[in-house]
Amino acid sequence: MKILSYLKKFYLFLLIGAIMQANESMGAKLPKTDERVIYLAGGCFWGLEAYMERIYGVIDASSGYANGKTSSTNYEKLHESDHAESVKVIYDPKKISLDKLLRYYFKVIDPVSVNKQGNDVGRQYRTGIYYVNSADKEVIDNALKALQKEVKGKIAIEVEPLKNYVRAEEYHQDYLKKHPGGYCHIDLKKADEVIVDDDKYTKPSDEVLKKKLTKLQYEVTQNKHTEKPFENEYYNKEEEGIYVDITTGEPLFSSADKYDSGCGWPSFSKPINKDVVKYEDDESLNRKRIEVLSRIGKAHLGHVFNDGPKELGGLRYCINSAALRFIPLKDMEKEGYGEFIPYIKKGELKKYIQDKKSH
């Protein structure tokens, strides 16, 4: 019996070792239990890897070759093995969903181009989404259906279970970190254009709003009133953080885009994302203006004018403090706005550098 027990343990050890060796050889190590992995092909992997590493919620990104005909390959043999240059993305699902991660991916690829991205042409530069979790297939399919409605032409993104993955040579790993200014077909700044989910926020009923808001907040957001200049909460606030819709909590503006226009109301050069605000013509007060409203709450925020600083884009979003709630940078994570912290920090650093140059 002892011999039989020993043999069972021995064969189990061999089996586990074989599985680990197989996973290692294909570059598909399983992430930790609280992490997820997806493999994305989008042209030259140098740029896509650097881009993915900039996205909040991504734990690690590395370059490799996916879904070829053979279990081994290298950069010189890709035309023979038919692997796609791909990026292995390990991410934290508590911080970013697969759906949102794919939307960031879609921002930097041409989804209808066949075997070509940027200046790179060939099968190795095809687009593809390769999954190891079968449950991801439905998420991927739904994301592609939504994308198809937005683009002209048939989507050419390959979707398959991962197979024959090989980690790329060390020379290719973190290439743009090793070679700043090296070739990259992707605009890495697009990672800083934060995506704000529209299904994460809802507009309360009018009854709830009347209980939740102060009289001034209600009159401003629901009846398009204007608060007094220089006598409002945020017109001269300089603290780092995010400004959200007082009615829904949807992120609207960043302290990094706030500046002193001298008008007496909070002024911003742009919203945190172009989709979070809507515009309507306003001909009240016998003059033409452009009203700014929140996307989900449809709350009146203020107006936008074209007399802003040219170096900031030339716009002045003149917004009522009563339409906003400010969340300090130190509280953003615990209040569920952690994904916007990198945007705030990068923007504040850029603003600091610009201020130094101007003085």
Swiss-Prot record:
Catalysed transformations (reactions): L-methionyl-[protein] + [thioredoxin]-disulfide + H2O = L-methionyl-(S)-S-oxide-[protein] + [thioredoxin]-dithiol; [thioredoxin]-disulfide + L-methionine + H2O = L-methionine (S)-S-oxide + [thioredoxin]-dithiol; L-methionyl-[protein] + [thioredoxin]-disulfide + H2O = L-methionyl-(R)-S-oxide-[protein] + [thioredoxin]-dithiol
Q: What is its EC number?
A: 1.8.4.11, 1.8.4.12
**An example Gene Ontology molecular-function term:** L-methionine:thioredoxin-disulfide S-oxidoreductase activity
The catalytic residues are C44, C318 (nucleophile)
Q: Give yes or no: UniProt keyword Isomerase.
A: no
Coiled-coil positions = none
Region entry Peptide methionine sulfoxide reductase A: which residue ranges? 36-189
Any one GO CC term of this protein is: cytoplasm
Domain spans labelled MsrB? 206-329
Gene3D superfamilies from the entry? Peptide methionine sulfoxide reductase, Peptide methionine sulphoxide reductase MsrA
What does the function comment of this entry state? Has an important function as a repair enzyme for proteins that have been inactivated by oxidation. Catalyzes the reversible oxidation-reduction of methionine sulfoxide in proteins to methionine.
Q: Which family does this protein fall into?
A: In the N-terminal section; belongs to the MsrA Met sulfoxide reductase family.
Q: What is this protein called?
A: Peptide methionine sulfoxide reductase MsrA/MsrB
Q: Please tell me the species this chain comes from.
A: Helicobacter pylori (strain J99 / ATCC 700824) (Campylobacter pylori J99)
